[in-house]
Design a protein with these regions (language model features):
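Short boundary/linker motifs that mark transitions into or out of structured domains
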Residues: 1-56, 118-122
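Short amphipathic alpha-helical recognition elements used for nucleic-acid or partner binding
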Residues: 48-84, 104
Length: 269
């Protein structure tokens, strides 16, 4: 955790328009495995060792992290083998798996106190103090927030917004078996952010933050558009509201092949 307050620049539909001064709670600069946004791994000294992960090593690490968060047992060794080495005969697949596991364990030693555990036919990741994983932290923060109710404390709210600002789960990694995890995380994030738009509706600065982050997870989210344009209009920033709306309309047409039919004036109501 960083105790100092820093300036955070929030992306708004690909253009930076608002700058908020917020406290930073998380540090992905060392001893970190990052799955939100793009895949990244940092060692104990802060060196970026992402390049040391071959596609197979990367896939194995991601698989173990995701399945361990889904269930403490992790994933059946056979299932992991079937997913990652489906093109190999049984013996060859087993040998390849064991070699990859050894290499992964060596790399994780550089990251910090985190290990791959094989137990009772399952593989899982065991986390210890000092190693940060953004995906794991995001799920934990969201879980805490739901347990505390929609009006959770401001610190937890800001932690959630900070970590959701990292972006969707593994946005640049495209493999079939990831889809269910991506969809689940996306749905969880979007539902929470939409709810927060309503809960925080009288806190304009927070709503603007939430809308910006919601656009990261769902670029065509109409609730984020309406909330942002409405507040900018109230604040007298009609030109910025028009720019946000115009970019949304362009992205809407580029993505769906049709015009966005809700006029800007309707968003101010």
């Amino acid at each position: 955790k960083e105790d100092n307050t820093q300036v955070e620049v929030l992306p708004v539909n690909e253009t930076v328009e608002e700058v908020a001064v917020v406290e930073k709670y998380f540090d992905r600069s060392r001893s970190a495995i990052s799955l939100l946004g793009t895949f990244n791994v940092r060692d104990k000294d802060g060196n970026d060792i992402t390049g040391a992960f071959t596609p197979r090593l990367k896939s194995l690490l991601i698989l173990l992290v995701l399945y361990t968060e889904k269930s403490k047992q992790g994933i059946l060794t056979k299932k992991a083998t079937d997913i990652l080495w489906s093109d190999k005969e049984e013996e060859s697949a087993r040998n390849n798996r064991n070699v990859t596991l050894r290499k992964l364990r060596i790399l994780l030693e550089k990251v910090g106190d985190v290990e791959v555990v094989s137990d009772a036919g399952f593989l899982c990741i065991r986390w210890h103090e000092g190693v940060f994983c953004d995906y794991r932290m995001a799920l934990d923060c969201i879980r805490q927030f739901k347990e505390n109710g929609d009006h959770g404390d401001d610190k937890l709210l800001n932690q959630i917004l900070e970590i959701l600002l990292y972006g969707p789960l593994l946005s640049n990694t495209i493999v079939d078996w990831l889809d269910e995890f991506k969809d689940s995380y996306s749905s969880l994030s979007i539902d929470l952010l939409r709810n927060l738009l309503d809960v925080q509706r009288n806190n304009y600065d927070t709503v603007l933050r939430i809308a910006d982050i919601l656009f990261l997870h769902d670029p065509l989210n109409e609730e984020a558009l309406a909330a942002k344009c409405s507040i900018l209009f109230i604040q007298g920033k009609k030109g910025i509201a028009k720019s946000v709306y115009d970019r949304f309309c362009k992205e809407y047409k580029d993505s769906l092949g049709e015009e966005y039919k809700v006029p800007l004036c309707n968003l101010y109501k």
